[in-house]
Amino acid sequence: MGFLIKVPTPRGVPLQESIRNLFFHVPMWFGMNILFIVSFIYAIKYLRSPKQEYDAYSLEFARTGTVFGVLGLITGAIWAKYQWGAAWSGDAKQNGAAIALLIYFAYFVLRGSLNDEEKKSRIGAVYNIFAFFMLYPAIWILPRLTESLHPGGQGLSLIHI
């Protein structure tokens, strides 16, 4: 989107097209993270007090977070094609984000495969918690331990033992 809409960039600063990425790609990931945190909280609430309302909130926040994640991947691929020459470079953060989203897609498949509503809600809440705990290593921890094209991805070379 930022490549289709003319977003003004500061003159004389070598950021060029990178600055536009901050208006679309980065907010998608922050939105995804916030929505997954809220979904995680409602999954815990459901397990503590099994109200269908908590399950519905947990599911819908996860769905919306997944939409933001997919949009983050798409906008990142557009930007990567422009900046790095390839939409998918196999970067650790790209791969981690794709794996994390696949884990959440499996959450929706799991919920869709169960017929008993109570069982669907309970198993879904447990899996949602699992998915949340897989999300942060996949997109925040592991990419920082390896070389990455993304900012902050210098890997273990920054750690001096």
Predicted regions: what they are:
Residues I19-F30, S58-R63, Q83-I99:
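Transmembrane alpha-helix entry/boundary detector in multi-pass membrane proteins
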Residues V67-G112:
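Membrane-interface helix-loop-helix modules in multi-pass inner-membrane proteins
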Residues M1-R11:
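Alpha-helical transmembrane segments of multi-pass membrane proteins
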Residues M28-Y42, I99-R111:
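Hydrophobic cores of alpha-helical transmembrane segments in multi-pass inner/ER membrane proteins
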Residues I159-I161:
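Conserved small/polar residues in nucleotide/adenosyl-binding loops
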Residues G124-W140:
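Hydrophobic alpha-helical membrane-insertion segments
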Residues T9-I19, W84-A86, E147-Q154:
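Membrane-interface helix termini and inter-helical loops of multi-pass transporters
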Residues R48-E60, L114-S121:
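Membrane-interface helix-boundary motifs at transmembrane edges
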